[in-house]
């Protein structure tokens, strides 16, 4: 740290207690004024703040008496159940591009429309001249989300129509970012790995004829090689992370910032800043850290009682990170099940067999079975507890040889589609800035 940074650090350390004292608001005041903290009710359900035609999450159904009854989770993209969309993919078909078209434009493409869309994306996987050298490689960062965000904001200076209004211009900008996000992520990682870890660096150009999943693996690996199963599993992971309603933190951020009238690059950079937060986009990393801890402390992975005993210690805060949590279990919205996890699980099993890691898959199965029981023993829960998609996604990425630094960027490569769809919907349907109210509880000083 520089002298000025040391000075600031010392000053900040002296001021933190007074900051905490004067910025703490009692929970009783939230109850007194009927304010739902974090825009969630006491059961964790999000407060209704808008309408969307892009997706829907179903976790409860209305009973005969009008009460909410927990049900198996459902995720809908533009009126289609995601389970149906994925089941209807033809043998040999990658689905990311087709479902991206659906989310962006509101209807499934015809054969010719899909071919045109795929070609446009493929031919748009290019960066400005010397951008990789001058921007990505000049300031490598271990935090690839920071690297990508910097690149996104810098790209705005290369766009002569950066602030031009109009749906067509915003579609152009969104599609450009969808196309190049894999490049920003992979190239950012290679630059970091070379300059910080002294590893060999290779920059592979994407193949415009390949899918997003294939290009990601091709650009990441030194030999450009991947199996069809690897690419299909990654394609499914991307599909299941593309969109998850308007209320998730990064998508809501996109809509809030878009409502201010800012440009596409700034709106997506804001969404990236939200997603990089460990409470949002880093869940699968915590699962992987937890699983490594379990593998190192549980001697017999097939012994359900031994696994159960260790998970109880975890819930009691005695082991791992001492926070009393089993990561990858439960969800802010879903109750009985996460539909993404149920779809993804079959792909994970196939990959684990191909990678000869089915013994680890069995450990995941055991945890999936016993963890909800242990959580129910230790906690008062308002709804069911089941594994979410993050429970398996990190395991998949590890089996694919994807470094942990790219786990959250992969989330972004998928979610940029949902962000773009919500940005376009916000531009089309809204002409007022989003401006919620805050109740002041400060004491006036004479």
Describe the role of every protein-language-model region.
Residues 1-446:
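Non-transmembrane, aqueous-exposed alpha-helical and coiled segments at domain scale
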């Amino acid at each position: 740290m520089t002298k000025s940074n040391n000075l600031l650090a010392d000053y900040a350390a002296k001021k933190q207690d007074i900051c905490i004292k004067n910025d703490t608001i009692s929970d009783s005041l939230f109850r007194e004024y009927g304010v739902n903290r974090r825009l969630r009710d006491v059961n964790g359900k999000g407060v209704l703040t808008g309408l969307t035609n892009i997706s829907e999450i179903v976790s409860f159904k209305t009973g005969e008496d009008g009460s909410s009854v927990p049900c198996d989770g459902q995720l809908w993209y533009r009126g289609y159940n995601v389970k149906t969309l994925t089941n209807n993919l033809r043998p040999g078909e990658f689905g990311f591009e087709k479902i991206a078209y659906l989310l962006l434009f509101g209807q499934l493409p015809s054969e010719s429309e899909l071919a045109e869309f795929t070609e446009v994306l493929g031919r748009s996987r290019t960066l400005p001249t010397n951008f990789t050298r001058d921007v990505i490689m000049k300031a490598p960062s271990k935090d690839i989300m920071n690297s990508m965000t910097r690149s996104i904001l810098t790209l705005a200076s290369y766009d002569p129509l950066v602030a031009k209004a109009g749906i067509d211009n915003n579609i152009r900008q969104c599609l450009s970012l969808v196309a190049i996000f894999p490049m920003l992520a992979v190239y950012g990682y290679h630059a970091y790995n070379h300059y910080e870890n002294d590893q060999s660096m290779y920059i592979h150009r994407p193949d415009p004829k390949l899918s997003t999943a294939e290009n990601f693996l091709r650009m990441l690996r030194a030999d450009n090689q991947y199996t069809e199963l690897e690419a299909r599993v990654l394609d499914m992971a991307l599909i299941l992370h593309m969109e998850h309603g308007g209320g998730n933190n990064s998508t809501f951020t996109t809509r809030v910032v878009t409502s201010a009238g800012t440009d596409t690059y700034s709106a997506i950079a804001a969404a990236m800043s939200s997603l990089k937060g460990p409470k949002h986009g880093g869940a699968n990393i915590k699962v992987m850290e937890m699983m490594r801890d379990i593998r190192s402390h549980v001697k017999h992975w097939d012994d359900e009682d031994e696994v159960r005993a260790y998970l109880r210690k975890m819930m009691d805060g005695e082991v791992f990170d001492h926070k009393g949590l089993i990561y990858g279990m439960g969800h802010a919205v879903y109750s009985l099940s996460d539909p993404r996890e149920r779809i993804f699980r079959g792909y994970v099993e196939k990959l684990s067999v191909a990678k000869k890691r089915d013994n680890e898959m069995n450990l995941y199965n055991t945890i999936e079975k016993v963890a909800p029981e242990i959580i129910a023993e230790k906690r008062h829960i308002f709804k069911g507890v089941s594994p979410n998609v993050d429970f398996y996604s990190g395991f998949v990425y590890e089996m694919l040889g994807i470094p942990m630094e790219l786990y959250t960027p992969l989330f972004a490569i998928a979610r940029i589609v949902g962000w773009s769809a919500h940005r376009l919907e916000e531009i089309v349907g809204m002409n007022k800035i989003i401006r919620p109210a805050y109740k002041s509880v400060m004491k006036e000083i004479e």
